[in-house]
């Protein structure tokens, strides 16, 4: 069977078609919460400029991945309606090179950027007493450095690929790069799992030091922001690790057990993790991040308000009132002398 016959059998298989429609619709719906999060939540939030910039970079990278999915899955959904011959269903080599590069970048770059966010939060903890006045340069440097590293990673990933033959799917990594993809996925999962644990302990350390570093209002404010943003980073990291683990587990199960109950190549391709877990993650991360960010910001406002507001009732209120009266009498007494 040649490629034209194979892609024809795959493209019109019912299960495969359903998976393409699911992924396309999920990707389209993912755009809106991500745009809302970036434009109406992160852009106007009161976080330090460095961490705010990195969050915007991170979710913009995910948005790029989502838009890439919208284009390539729209191709796989629409072309079968328009194809005149079987070979029309094949993916052009030039388009395949472009969108596969963007696809790998969209998956790997957010996982490097989240490491940069952790590094920035560590710096914010170390320099908590003066970090309020730190310029945007740190966030820009970390964000650009993460993207340059990932671009180099993608370049070397496809270095030996010629992309001189049409492909059945945009998401079929060439056989010569298959081992690289496995290495990349497992390495990123391991690194991000360690990062998740590190973020958890970073929240604990921030909470402990917040009670000790109370020498100024600005320091207390910075420590409170450190706790809120590190919790948000921990949440993002957890969702990323969870879904990426599901993706790898799902892929291994299909690879090992799939041939036993999925009889055709089309059925095997239709239930690949890339068609299910990654689009679902892209949808959930936008919605869940909006919800958790709103919750954490309300928590931050309440705690900061409690820090700077005087109590007017109870024992604390009576003590504050007494101290204020004593200060007035001391001032009057000093004036008479």
Swiss-Prot record:
Topological category with respect to the lipid bilayer: Multi-pass membrane protein
Phenotype reported upon loss of the gene: RNAi-mediated knockdown results in defective head and tail avoidance responses to Streptomyces and to dodecanoic acid. It also results in severely reduced calcium influx into ASH neurons in response to both S.avermitilis and dodecanoic acid.
A GO molecular function held by the record: transmembrane signaling receptor activity
GO cellular component: cilium; plasma membrane
Keyword Cell membrane: yes
Family annotation (InterPro entries): 7TM_GPCR_serpentine_rcpt_Srb
GO BP, one annotated term: defense response to Gram-positive bacterium
Keyword vocabulary terms for this entry: Cell membrane, Membrane, Sensory transduction, Transmembrane, Transmembrane helix
Keyword Transmembrane included in the entry's annotation: yes
Subcellular location: Cell membrane
Tissue: Expressed in the ADL, ADF and ASH chemosensory neurons in the head and in the PHA and PHB chemosensory neurons in the tail. Low expression also observed in the egg-laying structures in the mid-body region.
Transmembrane segments: 20-40, 62-82, 98-118, 138-158, 183-203, 234-254, 273-293
Family of the protein in this entry: Belongs to the nematode receptor-like protein srb family.
Function: Mediates recognition and avoidance of Streptomyces species by detecting dodecanoic acid secreted by the bacteria. Also mediates avoidance of decanoic acid which is not secreted by Streptomyces species but this may represent an additional important avoidance response in the environment.
Stated name of the protein: Serpentine receptor class beta-6
Lineage, uppermost ranks: Eukaryota, Metazoa, Ecdysozoa, Nematoda, Chromadorea
